[in-house]
Amino acid sequence: MKLLSLSLLALIACAADRPPAIDRERVLIGPVPLKRQLAWIDSALDRVVAIDASDDGHPSVHSWRIGRRPVFAAPTPDGERVLVVTRGEEALERGQVDEDPLLWSVDVRDPSSKPIAYPVSSPFDRIAVSADSGIAVAYFSEAGPDAEGFFRNPNELAFIDLTRPPDETNPTMKTIRSFGSAPSGIVLSPRMAVPGAEDPSERIFAFVLARNVVTIVDASHPDRDEVSIRLDGAGSNVLPRELVFAPNTATAYMRSDGARDVLELVLINDPPDANNPTANDYHPLLAELGAGGAPSDIAVFDTASGLRYVLAATPATRELVIIDADTAQFRKVGTPDPIDRIVVFPGNGEPATTAVLAQLGAPMPRVHSLSLGDIANPLARLDLETIEVGEPVRDLSPVPGRDLAMMVHDDNRTVLGMLDVEFRSVSPLQGIGRLDTYAFTPAGDFLVGTTTGVPRLGMLELSNLHPTDLRLDYPPRQVYALANGALIVDHGDPFGRATVVPTTASERKDAHVLSGFLLAGLLETESP
């Protein structure tokens, strides 16, 4: 195993002119997993540092300077950029500069790339990003003002078009109507067109969730007016939790705490007022689906013919509701248990073939399988098949792109099983140890995991359930499986320590240990 160490502490102690960064309060944000990188954000050094697990098996470390005092970071869904909100500061002493809050877009693919700074006016601590990585919305969490927040507007949002450089219209700052509640989250829709609208383009809509209200903003045109819709009529105290979309009909289906039923939100054409330059061209309609019970979980899938369906579990009625997303017609299937977990296989956007249902709230030693092959046939009989698994199921995690699911049978993650969805069979997972952290490789061929305090990386080949392990030099904190097949184990060292394993077939001699990389170049940091 190769050890790359950066011995900087002695040099720092002897430095005559200490850089201001040495005396700053230091908070590390991350790691943030990306396509083939793992990134950290350093609040003292004002930079993003990333390990690049390159395809040639030789990792490298790169850094990018950003603004002062990072608050929050999030990856883009394509795994190519990391977005960071920085608070900025007021220059009051040596080493400080006047700087407003900014959102930084850092392209980690290119070590020479220059981060793009978008002025966002407020130190937001949450970021929502569209599935195509083109639009970001920065907002405040429900945590309330921090120690430095004198005034804070919880209903303020910043809409950023990540495909354009910053200008007078990018970002667009917006304050939405609150109706007495602050946003609990933001969900960005896939691109979808409003049926019948004069503007036929496919747009992204931001669904701003709050207690008893949902506000919808055209995120592709954030300067246009938002529309809010009250949820009080759907229950006594409705808190939206989850949305799934049917973009063909500009429809969202919502699961909410406190709602009596599955809620349907449909965007319809509403021609704008020609005298109002900020008028929008849509209006939402809210409907209770009539499924007869509040859903505990929902899932969306597409058939081989391109039809979209929504599955909703209603434990109070012990039913699974199957909704045609384009017509809102539905049918019900009785369930032996009050289901609160739905997993659709094979996943990864492929046409679904099977749904597996489980009761996790009050764990039972069984799961249920529903074939989705005849789901579009209204005359087809839909029956559940019960699969006895021997131990209560406390968690159910699908393997990416495979008809497999890992079952956890105890709170310590020591008793595990692998469910083969196609053959309805269960195999106990042995020789792995306690899974404190784990990940599936993107191809779904390996389960990798670590145990706190044990310097080993466990690997389970899912085609034959053969376990192997790799000895590490240091105890692990978290393991990450990147899109290019590389594995990175973070050891939780504040100065930076990680083990990079090029592939699951790599031996110990092929692994690289990077130590001290978060301090690289500290003495070269310029002093203002």
Region roles according to the model:
Residues 1-13:
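Sec-dependent bacterial lipoprotein signal peptides
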Residues 14-528:
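Predominantly soluble domains enriched in secretory-pathway, periplasmic, or organellar proteins
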